[in-house]
Amino acid sequence: MKKFLSLALALCMVLSLAACGGGSSSTTPSSSPAPATSGTTTTAPADNSGSAAAAPADNTVQPDMNYTIRIYSNSNSTERTTWLINEAKAEGFNISIDDNSVISGDTAAVQAANENKDGDLIFGLNETRWGQIIDGQYENLKLVDWTPEWAGSVGNYKYDGKAYGIVIQNVLMLYRNDALGTNGAELHFNHWADVVNSGYKWYRQNKVGGTTNMNINSAMLYAFTDPSSPAGGISVDGWKTLWKFCADGVSGGDDYKYGFDPLNKGDVAISEFYSSALYGKIDAAADSSSNPLKGTFQPENWNLVDIKDGTYYIAEYIGVLDKAGRSEAETAAVKAFAEWFGSAEVQAAWGEEFDSFPCNEDAADQLYPDGVPAIYQLPNFALNKVSGTDKTYAAYVAEHNPEWTNIMTNLGFYWADNNAPAEPDWDNLDWSTLTQKQG
């Protein structure tokens, strides 16, 4: 997709940057609890001449635009870091960010920020990680009070006064409706877990870890929440169902990194994939298959499974870290960058460049003037309250995710096809042990 013009971004800065300070004392999340660099740390020198970003970040402190802003993120492919460095430089910002050959994944990003203690800003992650940061689970990661100009445009995707949504993603269940799939039959489920009784061949991932895999598990387990269950707040029937999903599903070993390939090749009728890359994958589907999926925005031989519950969304957020020894002018520069990056114009440009969907509703309107794509119109059960609790499902996932990971690891879920363990004796399991990390 074409890139938005740099001129538009500069104009945005002239109009909106000057009033990017502020803050709220609330730390309660409203929505929470929905590719070339060398592989080293990259620091871009800033071009400050005539830059609109040199305007004050708030009404009292002039930002130090010579300050190098250290950023941590898991949304850091080489394409993304290169784009961000170049666009930030054009706006007068110095930034330093590692690509994913140095830091890969949300766990690594958070751990590095916590251990290095040199971060000014963190973006990406998901509600689970942000909930942990907000709750103070990382000793060296504290957020400054901050409310951007665009805070009112991100809906419920915010931790008031602390962190604000920038990108929405979800997981999708897709199916072929040609002769390699349902042969014209439509699929309607009540829950994600109904796939195990669909009568069709489905793909399943081959490892426990990974953000997309975790989100698929969260979608599969949604119908089985039980706050009184010792099995990580999930009923035993839920774990039995997830086992069946593994046992009867097709993983393909290392041939499939994610679920698009097996569906695109016609090896399965149903698969799971993440929203942000889907349309780009379908555009290029014929490059890797003799039986490709066709019709990017108007599906020809595939569709979304109609699931009454909806799907599990996550949002990536941005927050300003409280860095020891940073001056007020340097902090003002960090806030100015965050204000700029989360603005409608920049998030629309980011979304167009990388096929992501912005939390910022004004950015979404710019990006999709003809209407929101179907994959982002699905109901979001991550924000539904879990019966018997005062928590949203996203918060419930954040609370129980370590237990779920331990259960799946200890029982051997998501094995390679030729290494299937025996099914557990579900009636005689010590859940108090299984929910703990072993070794």
Question: PLM ranges: what are they?
Answer:
Residues 15-19:
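C-terminal motif of bacterial Sec signal peptides marking the signal peptidase cleavage site
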Residues 21-24:
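Bacterial signal peptide processing site
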Residues 59-131:
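Early extracytoplasmic/lumenal segment of secretory-pathway proteins
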Residues 316-392:
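Mature extracytoplasmic/periplasmic domains
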Residues 383-439:
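Conserved C-terminal helix/tail region of periplasmic/extracytoplasmic solute-binding proteins
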